Amino acid sequence: MKKSIVFIFCCLSMFLSFGQENNADIGSEKVLDSLYREDQFYVGVTYNLLLNRPEGISQSGFSGGLHVGFIRDMPINKKRNVAIGIGVGYSLNVYNHNLFIDKEEGTQNTIFNSLEDVDFSTNRFATHIVEAPFEFRWRTSVPETHKFYRIYTGFKLGYLFSFNSNFKDPESRIKQTTINELDRLRMGITFTFGWNTFNFHFYYSLTPLFTDEALLGQETVGLRPAKVGLTFYIL
């Protein structure tokens, strides 16, 4: 009888001890889960394209972009692998092409011409944009590892706060920074997917770079940027 009582007491002690450990683990998981976020800082590099080009306009050389920012990750499910992201960032973009941009002498009117048959060494423009990305985020992440699949889709709103064009040929160099025909309000859709460190990123602008007042002959200049590249996330 005594042996039976001792055996039952030992079993109960082990059971209670196991239950306390499980409760402690569950409690720690809840605390960790309530704080878990992912992919809040980003750095991206892209190859830049100009779509919807007027006749006679083409890109030449390499056109690239650098993008950095912070996105606040706001999970919307218990596993915290589905989230909404809202943030702020900066985007630098350089485009090499044969669209000549200058000012009509004595006026503020902008001249747009094709350099299709002109010998030049440099012709490009750069844009500096402050952006607000909005994303719907899905991932296979857990707090213990940074290696997981992700699919993020959304859009970016932006403001083009600085523009400069640079033309150089053997005889002259022309720079322009004030272009009235710029469409400074930017909006585009985004799609990012990948695993671990390497994530492919796509961007397509819903608004042209130039307003309808920018003309090349009788055709609007337009130009819709598209970007293809890699995005790297931190924290």
Language model region names:
Residues 68-74, 88-90, 132-138, 153-159, ...:
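Residues on the lipid-exposed face of transmembrane beta-strands in outer-membrane beta-barrel proteins
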Residues 177-235:
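Predominantly the C-terminal beta-signal and adjacent terminal strand-loop region
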Residues 48-50, 89-95, 156-162, 205-209, ...:
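Structural signature of outer-membrane beta-barrel domains
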Residues 20-73, 231-235:
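Short glycine/proline- and aromatic-enriched beta-strand/turn motifs that initiate or cap beta-hairpins
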Residues 27-39, 75-82, 141-149:
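Short loop/turn motifs that connect adjacent beta-strands in outer-membrane beta-barrel proteins
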Residues 37-39, 60-66, 82, 126-132, ...:
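Residues that define the transmembrane beta-barrel architecture of outer-membrane proteins
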Residues 49-50, 58-115:
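Glycine- and aromatic-enriched membrane insertion/assembly motifs of diderm outer-membrane
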Residues 54-61, 96-105, 111-127, 160-188:
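Extracellular/periplasm-exposed beta-strand and loop segments of Gram-negative cell-envelope proteins
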